[in-house]
Swiss-Prot record:
It catalyses: acetate + ATP + CoA = acetyl-CoA + AMP + diphosphate. Keywords: ATP-binding, Ligase, Nucleotide-binding. CoA binds at residues 207-210, 326, 540, 613. ATP binds at residues 402-404, 426-431, 517, 532, 543. This is Acetyl-coenzyme A synthetase 2. Signal peptide: none annotated. GO terms for cellular component: cytosol. Belongs to the ATP-dependent AMP-binding enzyme family. PROSITE patterns: AMP_BINDING (PS00455).
Amino acid sequence: MSSDKLHKVVHEAHDVEARHAPEHFYNSQPGKSYCTDEEHYREMYTQSIEDPAGFFGPLAKEYLDWDRPFTQVQSGSLEHGDIAWFLNGELNASYNCVDRHAFANPDKPALIYEADDESENKVITFGELLRQVSEVAGVLQSWGVKKGDTVAVYLPMIPAAVVAMLAVARLGAIHSVIFAGFSAGSLKERVVDAGCKVVITCDEGKRGGKTVHTKKIVDEGLAGVDSVSKILVFQRTGTQGIPMKPARDFWWHEECVKQRGYLPPVPVNSEDPLFLLYTSGSTGSPKGVVHSTAGYLLGSALTTRFVFDIHPEDVLFTAGDVGWITGHTYALYGPLTLGTATIIFESTPAYPDYGRYWRIIERHRATHFYVAPTALRLIKRVGEEEIAKYDTSSLRVLGSVGEPISPDLWEWYHEKVGKNNCVICDTMWQTESGSHLIAPLAGAVPTKPGSATVPFFGINACIIDPVSGEELKGNDVEGVLAVKSPWPSMARSVWNNHARYFETYLKPYPGYYFTGDGAGRDHDGYYWIRGRVDDVVNVSGHRLSTAEIEAALAEHEGVSEAAVVGITDELTGQAVIAFVSLKDGYLSENAVEGDSTHISPDNLRRELILQVRGEIGPFAAPKTVVVVNDLPKTRSGKIMRRVLRKVASKEADQLGDLSTLANADVVPSIISAVENQFFSQQKK
C-alpha cells in the first residue's frame, strides 16, 4: 500500500477512476434516459429523502394502477417497526403485472422461456399469460383459496412458476416460493411455518441435463402434514407413473381446462402481504420475510426502470431463480410491472456448454444481463473463449448481484462480456430490502470498479461506528451500513414473529435499519460493501475486511476462489484463516522447482501469505491457508463463511441451518482439510 493512501480509510477508492457510460449505451437506447445525468440523480435523490411523500406519492400513481386511491403516502417509523406506505389504497399485483399490458398489447412478449433443452424454448405473450394466470387462479379459487391464505410454490425456473405466483396474487392470497432445490425436510419446515393450505409443484424438473424428482420430494416432505389439502402438479416432463394421491393431488392441465379464460383480480390493501420468502439465519429456523403489495411493487418497478434504464422495448435477462429474491424482483415483478419482456432461464451457464448465456443473449437480443459474480468467475475460469463466438452487441447494461464484485472481475466483465460498450451496475440489496439499496443509475451515475456506488431514491444510507453506535458523518469513513428512514419496498415483518424482525433489523441501532453489512463511504460519497459484519476480522486492533484479503488472494494465478474468516486467537484477539479453491491441475504434490504451472501445497501457502502481506500489510497475513476442492455456497451463489468459521473454530458439530447450501456435500471434505492442514500442524 502506498504511503499516500495509508491515511485514507477507504483507500481502494484511490486505485480506480470513475467510469462514464460509453457511447454505445446512449446510441443503443430506444428512448431518452429516465435519469439524464448525475445532477438529475442528485436532485431526485434529495427530494426522495427530504420529501418522501412528495416524491413517492406521484410515482405510485404513475407506475401502479389502483382500484382505490391511497389517502396517505407513509406512516410509522423505524423506532417502532410499524412502517406503512400508501395507506387505504387498494390494488392487485397480478393486474399491474399482466392485465393492463395484455389489454394494451396482447401480442407483446412477456415471458421468454429458455428451457434446459433449447429445443423446448418458447415465448408467452401478455395475452397468453393473462389466460394462464386466470385459469390457475380459477383452480385455486375453486379449492377455497382466498385473500390472506398462503400457498407454497415449489417449482423450477419455468413459466409455470411465474404463472403460479401471479395466480396466487390474483386472489389476494400470499405466495411462499420455496426453491426447488431444497430438500424434503426444508420444504416441510417452510410449508408448516407458513401454514400453507395448497402446494403448487411439478412432476419432475430438468436442470443441466439431469432430472430432478420434484413431486417425489414434495410427497416425502408433506408426509404427515395434514394442513395441506390440495397439491396442483404441473406436467413438466410427462414421465409416466408419477404417484398422485387421490383427492389431494391434481394435474394442472386437467384442472385448468375447466376454468374460464379470465378471472377478475381481487383488490387488496396496499399493506396486505404479497409474498413470504424464507431466508436462513445463522441460528434458529429460517425466517419468512414478509413483503407488502404496493410498496414492494413500486420499489421493484422503480429500481428496474432507473437503475437499469429499462425501456418497454428492452429484454431483461436475469439469471436468477424465483426461489430467491433476485428472481422475484428482477425476473418477475420489476419487468412485468413495467410491461418489459423477461427471460426465464431454467438451466445452468454450463449446459450444454459454456456458450449458453451468450446464445441466449444473441437469440433474444437481450439488452440487459443480470448475474452473480459466482457465475462470472466460473466462466472466466473455464469458458471465457465461448463469449467471442456469439453476437452480444444488443447488450447495453450488465448487472452484478449477490455479493460485491471485485475490481478485477468488474474489469473482466466490462471488457470480455460488454466489449467495453456497456454500463456495469454493481447492485447491493437483500431479501429484506425488496429492491436495490445501493446501485448506480445506468448512464446517469459514473461507476467505479468494486463500488456499488450510491443510494437509490429513498434510501437514506449511513455508516455507523459498530462500537459506539454513532453515525459517522462526512466521507472517507467505514463501519456498518444502515438506513435511517423507511423506504417503500422494505420488508414489513417476519411471518408470525414480528419480535424477531425487530430484534434482527431495528433493535441493533435504534432508529436505523441495520443491513448486517460492513461498508465504507469514500471521498466522493460512493459506497464500498465489505460483506457481512461477521466477516470483518479484528487482528491486533486492525479491522480487516475479509473481502480485501480475499481479493489479494484471488490475484494469485493459481487461485480460483477465496474465502477468509476470523477465529479467536489468544495472542492477537482474532486470526485470519484463508480457504482457497484452485484452478484445475494447478496443485501438485510432486512439483519441482522452476515449474511455473504446478506448485506444491507448502509453497502455495507460503506464496499466498506473502501475497497478502505485500498487498495489504503484515498484519493482514493469514495464520494459515487451507486448500479445499470447493467452497460452501448458498443456492444464490454466496459463500457461506459461517460454515468455514465454525469448522476452523473446532465447532463443526454446531454448523446450524445448512438448508440453503447448494453443495452441502463439500462440508465433510472441508472438515477433513482443516484437520489435516491446520489442526494437525498446530499439534506439531
